[in-house]
Amino acid sequence: MNYVFYHTVKVVVSSMSHFNHRVYAVKANHKFQKLHVIGSGMSRTLSQRVLPKFFRRKLAGASARPSQLDLLPEAESVDGLAKVVRKIKTEFGVEYVYCWHALLGYWGGIHPDEENVAKYGSVMKYPKHTPGVLTVEPSQAWDPLTVGGVGVPSPDTLAHFYVVTHDYLSASDVDGVKVDAQAVIGALGYKNGGGPAFARRVHAALEESVRAHFPDNGIINCMCHSTENIYNFKSSALARASDDFYPANEASHTVHIANVVYNSIFMGEIVLPDWDMFQSQHVAGALHAATRAIGGCTVYVSDHPGKHDFEILHQLVFPSGRVLRCRQAGRPTRDCLFRDVTRDGRTALKVWNRNFVNSVIGVFNIQGASWSRATNQFASLPKPISATLAELCPRDVEGIADRSTQGASFVVRSHRNRRIEILRLKECTSIMLMHKDWEIYTIAELLEQGDIKFAAIGLTAMYNGGGSILRIDMNGRSANVTAYGLGELACYASRAPTSVHVDGRAVSPDFDPRTGALSIDLGATEGTHELQFNW
């Protein structure tokens, strides 16, 4: 990197980027204190320090000018992290609180010249990326961490650093950690045995500390797609499958969906993919909610306080906070594997998944944008976005033939259109999707006993309504179904049943003889319900 302005760029990037903040002490109590700042003859109360003790910027090789906040007297005992966590849990009913930290403490690592962290033996290192990484993403050559450096602790002290950090968090009633900024670890392995060996030691120390301090295996791995990270997840079960969701970057909203779906082909075999948070009251809120519903992933939002779309959230989450999570990671259907669902102008993305009994396919028009290496940002395509035609059939769900009766037919119900069709394994239905439009289809095997045909489809009010069906069996002229949830349950029947019971109580179903649509009210109480149908 013998650029003419290299040193100037280094100072500017390092000084301006929060990626070059470094840890200079573990406790973050200062961030949560209420301190009085005197300025312009007026006193104002701050609920947060702009540069908290855990994250304060102290740049190696450059003089750091202290802020006005840094000159205030310390007050360790006031409004600490434990008090904040307790307030969140007691006043707002939040059951679990996780805290963020980077793999090496913060993006810029651990400060090499601070007395409080001197015991970790941190030294400044500048990432050395492999030729393959620089070919795929040339911008890594001038990434803030590459230019500004990372404070890398001695491998022998990492275990102690994690223990001290997690001791503090656990004592503050924190339930787990989200460990970010992992991908750079391989580029910092020189003089530490190489990237893979260094990553192995780091993850072993991290996971051992997590097991000791967060018994529920409370760790989310993030920005961790280099293989030296993924292949060292020995007990970690959850990892991000994508870049961030950027609410203000419109071009990124569709690309994000493509990234998580295609990355889950690989990551879904190793971890539970995390498709990141989204915002419900957002122009792309429903689109992203629909993908999370069938992704088999975590479901969480980054809504601004008071800005929530409950029509969307209620289709994702029950009143108890439970979700109808699919059984595995959502993956693209075979006919999408080698198509460009973001740029070719004609291919809709199709995502398949399985539930306990039924299957699900989501179709999405996410054409029109991509990541530009030339500009190093998400970019919308110049040509207008056209509608795409999506065709889907039951066999798009991998393994469905092995799980079904030979020669079976399937009931296919669309969530938004509420349309019911009966298809054979290779028969298809189709839908025209406008830009950023979507639909979710529940696929339920059609059971047959004599002249009676029946399928339990799922809750009509939930995106992944088919996930509510936990068990079904049909014997003679009766069928028994176990379902979870509340509200309207959709079924299909070739003829109206003579009686239906929910938890032993007789109910009056709605039946449409033209379509075979059979609706049963499970009531307003969320829970597991036993249903019996008789003909």
What residues fall within each predicted segment?
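Hydrophobic faces of well-ordered beta-strands that scaffold small-molecule active sites
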Residues: 97-99, 177-179, 219-221, 301
